[in-house]
Amino acid sequence: IMEIKAGNKINQQSNGDYVGIDEANSNIEALNGYIHTLKNILVYDDAVMRNDVLHKRIRFDAMSLPPQLTNNNIRWHNVDISDANGYTVTPDYCGEYFTFNDACSCLMWGSQGWAAFQGDEINMKDNYDFTLRLLPVPPGNWEFRIGYNAEGWRGMGQIYFDGVITGTPVDLKIGDVQGDARTGWVADESTADDGVENDKMMRNLGYMKAPESCWYAHDNIPLRDWYKALRYIVNQYSFQDYGAHKLRMRSVDFAGREFSIDYFEFIPVDMIRDEDRLY
């Protein structure tokens, strides 16, 4: 795994160093393509990658996990589909990256006016039992979160992380009503410190506001300012080996309820105290 930022900045370190394109010596036409010169040698330094480049919050969209959804033009092509309500796939369509039981209905959809990270989400309906293969992260102590949009038609699901049951079932209806004391959400503008203490209170309840860098086009506000846009703190884990992890969710509610998955976050535990809220 490597990190690529806007402007072709590869593996940028905290001191600002990165490997990039030497624009003055690039776009050189060759027989079968073009040559682009790098400013430095691209070397994988385990210490630098583990302790600097990859030692940061990692946020990723649920639909970005199975490569089949991007390679087959499902992702990015499911927004506001005319005369349709999204896409569905068979339980084995995505191989090991995303599987679910036959009793489940899977809906993949998106909308330019929906309060979702990157505009889309996966909704698992009926008696679902599904598993997602998450991104690999380096060894260390990490906190894992689920980003979602609270709605009255959501349901409850039991979470399993790497095969181990995690706490009590999470109810995605919680937060559907503004002022729900179970999440503790209070608008930043209604506080004396722009929401700083409210962020701490929400964390104590197991929740966080959505990132401020994401935009809610329907109301033309940052996603952080929408009370239904929440992050649920699943747990903190100590990973001994570098590798991918499995997230399983199983329905414990009425068949008509759904579990919505929008995006996920991993963050090193030692960064939580000083975590920025913008990005």
Task: Describe these PLM feature segments.
Residues 5-15, 41-279:
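Extracytoplasmic
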Residues 1-3, 7-11, 25-26, 36:
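Extended non-catalytic domains of envelope/secretory-pathway proteins
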Residues 27-44, 259:
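FKBP-type peptidyl-prolyl cis-trans isomerase
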